[in-house]
Amino acid sequence: MEKGQMLYEGKAKKVYTTDQEGIYWVEYKDDATAFNGEKKGTIGDKGIVNNRLSALLFEVLEKTGIPTHFIELLNDREMLVRKLEMIPLEVVVRNIAAGSLAKRLGVAEGLNLSRPVVELYYKDDALGDPFVNESHSLAMGWAEQSDLKEIQELGLKINGELQKILDQAGIILVDFKLEFGKAEGKVYLGDEISPDTCRFWDKETQEKLDKDRFRRDLGKVEEAYAEVYRRVKEVLKD
């Protein structure tokens, strides 16, 4: 398969066409941003970790019946994915209060939620990806009722599957962001699953193993990313 022209470059990835219809070529970058692009930097080998970790987790989710856009891992930084018509919503699943939820509700970071919370955010960098609900999404035509139901149900199912793996790896899944799209009328999980899109805490020490280390200038960012990948790979090696 041949890599074609670059379609667009995002904050963390470059997406290219291929010579096969319906398939994109994705390259993961080391660039890092936070606070809607206000903070910028580089995390060494982030692209490698995010590419390989996403591939591992997409493969596991596929085996449980969750459709993803993942097709094939090409090398350290690149993969082939299915072309999707993206739903312009982020689905955020939270198991523990942290980040914007803790701030918005005035609760301490680290509070265990009695059940997973599912939130929707409208994908728009200029607006800061605002928190929205189903009524907004339907009224604005961002998604159909059936798709809203499906992506939230998939979010909870993905949460359960990821928690099984991460628990064995000694990692707490605090919260995470998902993006979905459609191809031929079917909903697929898109984007990535990585320390860029998830909050991971060490189960014993509660040490942060994700992009919060970059956001908050905690140091050892590269080491945290690599450690997550190492642990997950070890759990899934069989």
From Swiss-Prot:
InterPro entries: SAICAR_synt/ADE2_N, SAICAR_synt_PurC, SAICAR_synth, SAICAR_synthetase, SAICAR_synthetase_CS
Gene: purC
MF terms in GO: ATP binding; phosphoribosylaminoimidazolesuccinocarboxamide synthase activity
Record-given protein name: Phosphoribosylaminoimidazole-succinocarboxamide synthase
EC number: 6.3.2.6
Source organism (scientific name): Desulfitobacterium hafniense (strain DSM 10664 / DCB-2)
SUPFAM superfamilies xref list: SAICAR synthase-like
Gene3D superfamilies: ATP-grasp fold, B domain, Phosphorylase Kinase, domain 1
Pathway involvement of the protein, from the record: Purine metabolism; IMP biosynthesis via de novo pathway; 5-amino-1-(5-phospho-D-ribosyl)imidazole-4-carboxamide from 5-amino-1-(5-phospho-D-ribosyl)imidazole-4-carboxylate: step 1/2
Family according to the record: Belongs to the SAICAR synthetase family.
Cleavable signal peptide: none
PANTHER family, sorted: MULTIFUNCTIONAL PROTEIN ADE2, SI:DKEY-6E2.2
Pfam name, any one: SAICAR_synt
